[in-house]
Amino acid sequence: MSIFIGGAWPYANGSLHLGHIASLLPGDILARYYRSKGENVLYVSGSDCNGTPIAIRAKQEGVTAKEIADQYHEEFQRCFRSLGFTYDCYTRTDSEHHHETVQNVFLRLLEEGHIYKKIVEQAYCETCTQFLPDRYVEGICPHCHEAARGDQCDACSAILDPLDLLEKKCKLCGSTPSVQETEHFYFALHTFQEQIKRAVEIAKQTGTWRDNAIQLTERYVKEGLLDRAVSRDLPIGVPIPVEGYEDKKIYVWIEAVTGYYSASKHWAEETGKDDQEFWDSEAKTYYVHGKDNIPFHSVIWPAVLLGIGEEAIPRHIVSNEYLTVEKRKLSTSKNWAVWVPDILERYDPDSIRYFLTVNAPENRDTDFSWREFIYSHNSELLGAYGNFVNRTLKFIEKYYGGIVPKRSIEVELKDKVEGLYKHVGEAIEQTKFKVALETIFDAVRFANKYFDEKQPWKQREDDPVSCEETIYNCVYLIANFANLLEPFLPFSSERVRNTLSIVKRNWEPQNTLPSRIDSVQPLFERIDVKQIEHEIEKLYGAVK
């Protein structure tokens, strides 16, 4: 089976925060899981280096957009590597390859009659002497009357045109813009109305899109899909490949999602492999992002793919809700966020991955609290999983000289483990990652209870054979926990596998166990609860 996984492209205009990771982490869990099943996986993403936020920040700081993009693209790569993300291709939208691919898609849509020219009115700043596309305009949403940008309202998810806003202001200088006529290219989105309607109906029947994606897309379809501009007067971006229009750029909403396609093509060129299998109707596709990106993946990207004759429209849309911090909405402008480079300096990446999975905003907004994060690490990772692994392996090291006693696996435990692979695998494929991880940790708690009830410290003297059976079965559980947890907790899983000298990582029960263990070290370290107060003080102290 061919599995395509696309992770949303973060804007390279500032550091990643935990809200980004909460929405993107499911992609890596899926990629690791499907690879362990032996499926053909292509997992791609990249840094959005053409967006308006980058141009605005560059102008504000008096540097080039490329300098800003370079800085954060490199930082993103370091963060994703440190968190264990296993992208097959992580690229950037200001690359020559991406520009060429996007221009080819634009020309194909133009040739097929899906793009046309139109004279329109657009916001123009007399002070800055330039047209103001999308995020260059801020104001009040006409639908919910909350603060909004010119391209979209985060409060109600409405897709907007800058002229829709009430109380419009230029993002650069704060002036009230005027309105002037200009010519732009438009995408005939309305012609895909029935196909998008059918796609959301299928998703609703099969449960392959998150509820928020279904509800929002149904709303767009009910209101009727409107044609959207595909060109803008922007300082950076992909130039329109039409003579006489080279000074205009392809609008980021169509250019950025085409990054999935350009990354796929780039991967094919780099590896010499054929990527077409990931774009036919048999491919299983997952798109992983936050709810603010829903319309771009449930409406616009499917329409673009259909327009160029590709069949692999998004089958699974994994659109998480928002993550708050200490019960307050994340705000990068106010510095109310937990920044990824910062948290990685002090905490185990598996602790971050664990918390953002069991506390994932899968169907509703959830909160990151330092208290819950640290107590979660100490009680679940250290107290449950780490405790079971260490008490078992230390027992072997102390009483058997590191030699694993060879006995038989209990039928009940074997059935339980086989059931775990089945149920956890099904939950992952259905994008129920929290359920999947909680199912494994239920088994971890069962394993601790098993150890306590068997009392090997007593069996060793009263019934040595039973003691060996207990320990052998505990090693069996540990080997399989490391395997089952690999998509979620790759770093600790690798440490366990190294201790047990296990190389095989297929998604199936590990029945062949090691004959000996080496260098047993604690799987996790306890975090001092005094850190809670320190982290909260640091968070409040950084607020602007």
UniProtKB/Swiss-Prot annotation:
Top enzyme class, one word, equals ligase
What are the BP-aspect GO terms?
methionyl-tRNA aminoacylation
One Gene Ontology term of the molecular function aspect: metal ion binding
Q: Which GO terms describe its cellular component?
A: cytosol
The EC code for this enzyme is: 6.1.1.10
Which cofactors does it use?
Zn(2+)
Instruction: Cite the InterPro entries for this sequence.
Output: aa-tRNA-synth_I_CS, Anticodon_Met, Met-tRNA_ligase_1, Met-tRNA_synth, Methionyl/Leucyl_tRNA_Synth, MetRS_core, MetRS_Zn, Rossmann-like_a/b/a_fold
Q: Where is this motif: 'KMSKS' region?
A: 329-333
What does the entry list as the binding residues for Zn(2+)? 141, 144, 153, 156
| Positions contributing to ATP binding | 332
Q: How is the cofactor bound?
A: Binds 1 zinc ion per subunit.
Q: Which UniProt keywords apply?
A: Aminoacyl-tRNA synthetase, ATP-binding, Cytoplasm, Ligase, Metal-binding, Nucleotide-binding, Protein biosynthesis, Zinc
Reactions it catalyzes: tRNA(Met) + L-methionine + ATP = L-methionyl-tRNA(Met) + AMP + diphosphate
- The sequence motif named 'HIGH' region is recorded at 10-20
The job of this chain, per UniProt, is described as:
Is required not only for elongation of protein synthesis but also for the initiation of all mRNA translation through initiator tRNA(fMet) aminoacylation.
Family according to the record: Belongs to the class-I aminoacyl-tRNA synthetase family. MetG type 1 subfamily.
Task: Return the NCBIfam families for the record.
Answer: metG
Quaternary structure, per UniProt, is: Monomer.
Q: What is this protein called?
A: Methionine--tRNA ligase 2
UniProt source species: Bacillus cereus (strain ATCC 14579 / DSM 31 / CCUG 7414 / JCM 2152 / NBRC 15305 / NCIMB 9373 / NCTC 2599 / NRRL B-3711)
